[in-house]
Amino acid sequence: MMSAAPVLLYTKTGCPYCAAKRAELAARGVAVREINVSERPEVVAELLKVTRGRRIVPVVVEGGRIEIAPGGGSSF
C-alpha cells in the first residue's frame, strides 16, 4: 500500500547521489515529488530550513523523517 503523501526528494542537476536515490525510491515503488534546486532556485531557502543550513543534496523528506545525503551527497 502506497502512502498518501509523496516523499519529497530534493536534488540538483548532474548529482549522481540524487540519481541513485531516485532510482532506489522508484525500485521500492515509492511515490516521489522531486524538487530540483538547479531548476528551481526559489526553493533553496526552503531546503536550507530542512537541512539547517547545509547546502547538500539529495535530501529525502518522508513524513516527519528527514535524510540528508544518505549514501553521500553533492553540495550546491
Question: Where does each model-flagged region fall?
Answer:
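Structural micro-motif
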Residues: 51-63
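Local sequence-structure signature of Cys/Sec-based thiol-disulfide redox active-site neighborhoods
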Residues: 1-33
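Thioredoxin-like thiol-disulfide oxidoreductase module
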Residues: 36-54
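Non-catalytic, surface beta->alpha helical segment in thiol-disulfide oxidoreductase systems
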Residues: 61-76
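Residue-level recognition of specific faces of alpha-helices
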Residues: 17, 43-46, 59
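Glycine-/small-residue-rich active-site loops that bind phosphorylated ligands and cofactors
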Residues: 16, 39, 67
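Residues that form or flank phosphate/diphosphate-binding pockets in enzymes
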Residues: 19, 42, 70
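Solvent-exposed, flexible loop/coil residues
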Residues: 21, 41, 61
